[in-house]
C-alpha cells in the first residue's frame, strides 16, 4: 500500500469537489452570464490526515515515500479501500461485473456511456436497478472514473444500456473491456498541496495541514 493511500485510508475527513470551471460576468444590461470552460471536470480531494502518528519505522518510511514522490509524480488512489469507509463509494445497483457482466461499448460518446449487458445482466428481471445516481463506474485499466447521474434500469429487450455520466468521455476503452464500479474504481492524481511534518514529544509526528490532490487529466 502506498504512503498516500495509507493517509487516505485513515483520514479524519475527505472533501471532494467535482465542480466545473465556470466563467461568470455581468453584462451592461445587468444580465448574469456564465460559461462552463472545463469539459473534463477533474476531481479534487482535500484530505485531513489523522491527528497523530507514532514516529516508528513504518511511519518514517511512509513519510519518506510521500516526500520523494512530491508534487510532480502521479499516484493512483482508491476511495473506500478499507471496510470502514467502503460505504462512501459503494455500488448501489444489482448488476453483475466481471467476465459475464458489463463491458465497454465503443458506441459511447459524450456523456453517454454505452455498456454491453453481458450474459449475467441480460438474465436479470426487467426493471432491475443496474445503476443509481451517484454510482462511480470505470473501464478496467482506464485512468478516468465517471459518476452516474440518473438511475438505469434493466431494459425489457436489447443487449446494451446507456449510462449518463457527469462528464464527457475523456478516453475510449477497447471494445469489450470489463467495467468496474464502486470501491474498485481508482483515480490518478497529483498532490497540489503537500503538508510539512511536525515532530512532537512522546515519539509522535503530525502533518501540519491538509493534503490537496487533483486528478491528473492528460
Kindly give the residue locations of the regions a language model identified.
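Extracellular/virion structural assembly segments
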Residues: 1-218
Amino acid at each position: 500500500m502506498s504512503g498516500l493511500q495509507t493517509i487516505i485510508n485513515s483520514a479524519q475527513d475527505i472533501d471532494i469537489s467535482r465542480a466545473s470551471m465556470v466563467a461568470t460576468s455581468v453584462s451592461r444590461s445587468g444580465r448574469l452570464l456564465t460559461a462552463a470552460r472545463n469539459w473534463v471536470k477533474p476531481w479534487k480531494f482535500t484530505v485531513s490526515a489523522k491527528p497523530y502518528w507514532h514516529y516508528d519505522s513504518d511511519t518514517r518510511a511512509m513519510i519518506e515515500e510521500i516526500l520523494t514522490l512530491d508534487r510532480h509524480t502521479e499516484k493512483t488512489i482508491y476511495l473506500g479501500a478499507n471496510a470502514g469507509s467502503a460505504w462512501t463509494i459503494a455500488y448501489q445497483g444489482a448488476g453483475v461485473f466481471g467476465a459475464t457482466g458489463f463491458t465497454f461499448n465503443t458506441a459511447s460518446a459524450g456523456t453517454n456511456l454505452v455498456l454491453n449487458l453481458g450474459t449475467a445482466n441480460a438474465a436479470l428481471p426487467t426493471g432491475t436497478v443496474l445503476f443509481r445516481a451517484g454510482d462511480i463506474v470505470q473501464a478496467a485499466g482506464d485512468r478516468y472514473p465517471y459518476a452516474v447521474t440518473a438511475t438505469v434500469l434493466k431494459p425489457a429487450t436489447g443487449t446494451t444500456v446507456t449510462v449518463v455520466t457527469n462528464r464527457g468521455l475523456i478516453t475510449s476503452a477497447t471494445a469489450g473491456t470489463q467495467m468496474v464500479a464502486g470501491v474498485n474504481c481508482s483515480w490518478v492524481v497529483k498532490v497540489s498541496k503537500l503538508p510539512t511534518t511536525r515532530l512532537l514529544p512522546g515519539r509522535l509526528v503530525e502533518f501540519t495541514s491538509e493534503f490537496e490532490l487533483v486528478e491528473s487529466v492528460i
